[in-house]
Amino acid sequence: MACDFDITKENIYDYIIEDTPGADEAIKALSGICSQRADSQWIIAHGELPDNRQLNISSLGYFTIPKLYGLMEGDADISALDEIGALRVLGQDNLQADGSNVLIGYVDTGIDYLNDVFKDRLGNTRIQAIWDQTDRTETDVANTYAHFGRVYEKDEIDRAIEADNNGENPYSYVAQRDTSGHGTLMASISAGSYTDGYVGVAPGAELLVVKLKQSKQYLRDFFLIKDDVPAFEESDI
């Protein structure tokens, strides 16, 4: 059953179900439950939390509860690019190993799409799309690819970059921002363009970005995660 309510609300719980024979029919028979297929093996289901906000593990099964994931601790060391030989490989044009015709996916805290390291030589974005799961803005634009949040495609990102170049507000076109900087750092290391003496591993690659929303409070409570610690749901990833 498709979801006709806001699955991002705090009073909606999420769980992961293996698509065994009869699982789909069992979900459809439940009242107030909606589901969406993650792939050929897994189903993500959503329903209203009980009033006490406690998960009934005995009936649901621990494996159905989305696990929480955090960010890499500490600062990334970009000197590793040289140590793994990435810069030496890029210097050999005959290898054509700059990531051209490759699409790299990032599921993280978002990306600073205005940063020059994500643009090509003409100043256009190399980002093909950004799915901002945190975007709750009402819009008339159809969400073709996602059940919540907002998907921005390449032409919209280029429009935002052009606005920024003209002294306008780019975020009126593409509102997504990487307030943490973690996603931007990871993307720049792996796919940063040649900029001010810096280059990533695959400067010719295109990027596909997901900005994850923070996990719901009931899962933080269940796993004893502090409120000030970034945590992301397995079902969103």
Give short role names for the model-derived ranges.
Residues 91-233:
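Subtilisin-like serine protease catalytic core
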Residues 1-103, 110-126:
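Autoinhibitory propeptides
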